Amino acid sequence: MATSANLDIGAQLIVEECPSSYSLSGMPDIKIEHQPDSSAEEGSAQGVAMGMKFILPNRFDMNVCSRFVKSLNEEDSKNIQDQVNSDLEVASVLFKAECNIHTSPSPGIQVRHVYTPSTTKHFSPIKQSTTLTNKHRGNEVSTTPLLANSLSVHQLAAQGEMLYLATRIEQENVINHTDEEGFTPLMWAAAHGQIAVVEFLLQNGADPQLLGKGRESALSLACSKGYTDIVKMLLDCGVDVNEYDWNGGTPLLYAVHGNHVKCVKMLLENGADPTIETDSGYNSMDLAVALGYRSVQQVIESHLLKLLQNIKE
């Protein structure tokens, strides 16, 4: 299990921050990060393609997994911001048209299109934006640059590049290949919510039981973000629902910490032990209460009541 220094979530959980913005310091993040963004987190860069850098943590720390969740949620906020910017741009054009305001581009100014993950829901650095490539509008279909060879099998899995991933696996037999931290393509895909990739990897021989150097599992990574579809696929493969990592974090504790109600319920129904405690003495119920997650607390309470009723019978 963990040392007390790694998993100390006592009164600090309640006093320092509210549940909605709660985060714990010191967690090396798992995230897809663009080159302009700051990257002070620990971990090794796996590669850069079209301005994208992949970072893995040296250890997956239960105490600060909220920062991992927050980093993966950044994409959602970027999508919202892009929609707002798009709406403002359209409104501006319509306003100028209604007022007969004629504008012309400033001389000497070149417009450079920057593609980010928020450009499309399933962004890929090796795919051009197809926003203006509808055939019925007379636009030409953009071509995909041949950059697949510059990406590792782990990056392909994280991005959901099924075609290139399948080709790479067939040619090199790297379906269970581990990176410097012991992470497999399946773990990368699970951490980034790539449902189709996870299903493909499992169907083609990926081992869901493999653990990272810090005993990180694909199940724990999926639970920390609440990817219930991926969690279900992994549970159906018979993975250990109570597998703990280097600091005592279990899939259930990660799901509770992320306030993922459906995921918590699914884990409990599949044998997750709610009484397992961290090194500092906190179990899943204690953690839910400390973070103020009432829905999660109710799910755990209901499960415990059922267990007690079964014992009486």
From Swiss-Prot:
Keywords (A to Z) from UniProt: ANK repeat, Cytoplasm, Cytoskeleton, Membrane, Repeat
Name of the protein in its database record: Ankyrin repeat family A protein 2
Signal peptide residue numbers: none
KW Kinase (keyword) present: no
GO biological process: regulation of gene expression; regulation of protein-containing complex assembly
Stored PROSITE patterns: ANK_REP_REGION, ANK_REPEAT
Chief location bin: cytoplasm
Alphabetized InterPro entries for the sequence: Ankyrin_rpt, Ankyrin_rpt-contain_sf
Note on domains (UniProt): The ankyrin repeats, mainly ANK 2, ANK 3 and ANK 4, mediate interaction with a wide array of PxLPxI/L motif-containing proteins including HDAC4 and LRP2. The PxLPxI/L motif of interactors can contain a Ser or a Thr residue in position 2, which phosphorylation prevents the interaction with ANKRA2.
Membrane topology: Peripheral membrane protein
UniProt-listed Gene3D superfamilies: Ankyrin repeat-containing domain
Subunit structure: Interacts (via ANK repeats) with CCDC8 (via PxLPxI/L motif); mediates the interaction with the 3M complex which is composed of CCDC8, CUL7 and OBSL1. Interacts (via ANK repeats) with HDAC4 (via PxLPxI/L motif). Interacts (via ANK repeats) with HDAC5 (via PxLPxI/L motif). Interacts (via ANK repeats) with LRP2/megalin (via PxLPxI/L motif). Interacts (via ANK repeats) with RFX7 (via PxLPxI/L motif). Interacts with AHRR. Interacts with NEK6.
ANK repeats: 148-180, 181-213, 214-246, 247-279, 280-313
Any one of the GO CC terms: cytoskeleton
The protein's role, per its UniProt record: May regulate the interaction between the 3M complex and the histone deacetylases HDAC4 and HDAC5. May also regulate LRP2/megalin.
Species, as recorded: Bos taurus (Bovine)
Localization annotation: Cytoplasm, Cytoskeleton; Membrane
Domain of life: Eukaryota
Keyword Signal: no
A molecular function GO annotation: histone deacetylase binding
